[in-house]
Amino acid sequence: GQGERQSATASGQPAGKVMGASGAPGGVQLIRLPNLGASDDTRADENNDSPRGKLLLDGSNVSRAVQDVRRSLGTDLTDRWELDDDANRGRFLLRPYKPMYISFMDWTTSLNGTPGTPNPLNTTDAGNASLANQGRRAETTFQISFKSKVAENLFGDNGDLWVGYTQRSMWQIYTQQLSRPFRETNYEPEVMAVFRTNYRLGGWHGRLASVSLNHHSNGRSLPLSRSWNRIIFQAGLERERWTLLLRPWWRIPENAKDDDNPDISNFYGRGEAVAIYRHGGHEWALTVRHSLRLNPSRGSVGLEHAFPISSYLKAHINLFHGYGASLIDYNHRQTRIGIGVSLTQWL
């Protein structure tokens, strides 16, 4: 079969197509909802023209209803990554990627006053302390993140090519005596090949698999330069209101002399898992990174909560503990708490 991207109703209409309802009141329309993750029994019902999957709705609410039902079926990944025809919006348009937020107050238990690495060229000390992280433990942090699809159906009716960009900045806005500098900014462009999947694993539905080439750097000169390149593999699974992203990666080796941070994998990690739960307009996201080594065992844990405060804006609270809050702090352990607003979330 052609998979979910090619799903259609038994009547020959594309999934989700709006059809007129004979005898229905003015403005009321009959729609058939997308056949997502349906069992064989469900498909049989549809072929027998069962009312399952049909709703009578006011025309102005059709789009919202389709979106709500898709989410209740566990299709957030399908919508965010445009994995079927109903979700497909075409190429060369900006789409949300990772959360976009601003934490007006982001407080840390410990500033990294003399950041360093095993490479002596990338280490600060008393002799160049003016180059080190300075300022207050409270700052403003914001992140922008977007992606765009540049090619579709690389392998038959599956496989899309995306480009993405994420930028996270830490702004010492409360440090007036230092002219409110940006303490750290991390840049993360990447190219991603994303494939639709359809399998079951312990009650979870595997929706996507991807592989990406990722560059991550802070754009600074020695001794504060930090950077690395990775190949990131990703599996995306869903279960009702839950979404799980499993993201192991492999660091592309560098020449030892030019390596800004040769031990970054032992602190920042060799992979991460992101568990997302959505309900009633709220979204909780738990991110766990780990070095995948037992001695020593290092990594981080982060928790985000976003909830509505207006029609288009959500409050955003985030907690972080461990290593890698930023690249300059990849080997500095700290606890952070941030409070602000978000425009987009993981899903």
In which residue ranges do the predicted regions lie?
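Outer-membrane beta-barrel "beta-signal"
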Residues: 317, 333-347
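Outer-membrane beta-barrel initiation region
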Residues: 5-178, 185-189
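Detector for outer-membrane/organellar transmembrane beta-barrel domains
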Residues: 216-291
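Transmembrane beta-strand segments that form the barrel wall of outer-membrane beta-barrel proteins
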Residues: 127-131, 167-169, 209-219, 244-252, ...
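Residue-level detector of the transmembrane beta-barrel scaffold of outer-membrane proteins
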Residues: 93-108, 160-164, 210-212, 243-247, ...
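Residue-level signature of outer-membrane beta-barrel architecture
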Residues: 148-150, 193-197, 215, 237-239, ...
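Short loop/turn motifs that connect adjacent beta-strands in outer-membrane beta-barrel proteins
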Residues: 151-161, 197-208, 240-243, 278-281, ...
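Residues that define the transmembrane beta-barrel architecture of outer-membrane proteins
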Residues: 138-144, 159, 183-189, 207, ...
